[in-house]
């Protein structure tokens, strides 16, 4: 028998409906964490079913850090104005702006990395591997492994989340998709830092 208090607690933690929470707890034999996982999967599936719906609502958020030394503008989209106004969504957008300020990503996703940048990076990684004396037959595997690190450092969605390094930014977004039941897309961002790109005079 599933306790009503557990159903209520699960609903508060996930934002899912009462009957969905009851079913999740039944499926998970009362295990709260497994029930949350069940709902996340279900929530993601629900959002995926509406993949044709355009995520055209959302927020543009400005974040200033370090006493005005670093500034970030970020646009994150969802499907409805209702979700855009929720505290959960606003909190997510703020956290994403903080992530950009702290971790300096260059791109939103790996698909956004230009072909010429990727080609140049592969060329550098190949030269590094050969200079280390690695045999030619394993060089491609080494390049693939180091490219993953490049993506993790330079693509926002693949970076470890600054408030919980065991999760990626994409994991964080997936949790919000499951909770809010809508597609959430990071559209674009720009990061400014005082003095960036200015060549200092030697005088």
Swiss-Prot record:
<comment type="function">
    <text>Associates with the EF-Tu.GDP complex and induces the exchange of GDP to GTP. It remains bound to the aminoacyl-tRNA.EF-Tu.GTP complex up to the GTP hydrolysis stage on the ribosome.</text>
</comment>
<dbReference type="Pfam" id="PF00889">
    <property type="entry name" value="EF_TS"/>
</dbReference>
<dbReference type="InterPro" id="IPR014039">
    <property type="entry name" value="Transl_elong_EFTs/EF1B_dimer"/>
</dbReference>
<protein>
    <recommendedName>
        <fullName>Elongation factor Ts</fullName>
    </recommendedName>
</protein>
<keyword id="KW-0963">Cytoplasm</keyword>
<keyword id="KW-0648">Protein biosynthesis</keyword>
<dbReference type="InterPro" id="IPR018101">
    <property type="entry name" value="Transl_elong_Ts_CS"/>
</dbReference>
<dbReference type="InterPro" id="IPR036402">
    <property type="entry name" value="EF-Ts_dimer_sf"/>
</dbReference>
<feature type="region of interest" description="Involved in Mg(2+) ion dislocation from EF-Tu">
    <location>
        <begin position="80"/>
        <end position="83"/>
    </location>
</feature>
<dbReference type="GO" id="GO:0003746">
    <property type="term" value="F:translation elongation factor activity"/>
</dbReference>
<dbReference type="InterPro" id="IPR001816">
    <property type="entry name" value="Transl_elong_EFTs/EF1B"/>
</dbReference>
<dbReference type="GO" id="GO:0005737">
    <property type="term" value="C:cytoplasm"/>
</dbReference>
<keyword id="KW-0251">Elongation factor</keyword>
<dbReference type="InterPro" id="IPR009060">
    <property type="entry name" value="UBA-like_sf"/>
</dbReference>
<comment type="similarity">
    <text>Belongs to the EF-Ts family.</text>
</comment>
């Amino acid at each position: 028998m599933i306790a009503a208090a557990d159903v209520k607690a699960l609903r508060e933690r996930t934002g899912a409906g009462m009957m969905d929470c009851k079913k999740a707890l039944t499926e998970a034999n009362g295990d709260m964490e497994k029930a949350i996982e069940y709902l996340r999967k279900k929530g993601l599936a629900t959002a995926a079913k509406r993949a044709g719906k355009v995520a055209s609502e959302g927020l543009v958020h400005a974040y200033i850090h370090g006493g005005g030394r670093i500034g970030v503008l970020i646009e994150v989209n969802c499907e409805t104005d209702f979700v855009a106004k929720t505290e959960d969504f606003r909190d997510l957008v703020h956290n994403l702006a903080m992530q950009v300020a702290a971790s300096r990503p260059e791109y939103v996703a790996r698909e956004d990395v230009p072909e010429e940048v990727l080609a140049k990076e592969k060329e550098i990684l190949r030269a590094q591997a050969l200079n280390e004396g690695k045999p030619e037959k394993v060089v491609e595997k080494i390049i693939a492994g180091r490219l993953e690190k490049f993506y993790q450092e330079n693509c926002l969605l693949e970076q470890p989340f600054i408030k919980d390094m065991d999760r990626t930014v994409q994991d964080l977004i997936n949790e919000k998709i499951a909770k809010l039941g809508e597609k959430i897309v990071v559209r674009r961002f720009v990061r400014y830092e005082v003095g960036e790109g200015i060549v200092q005079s030697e005088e």
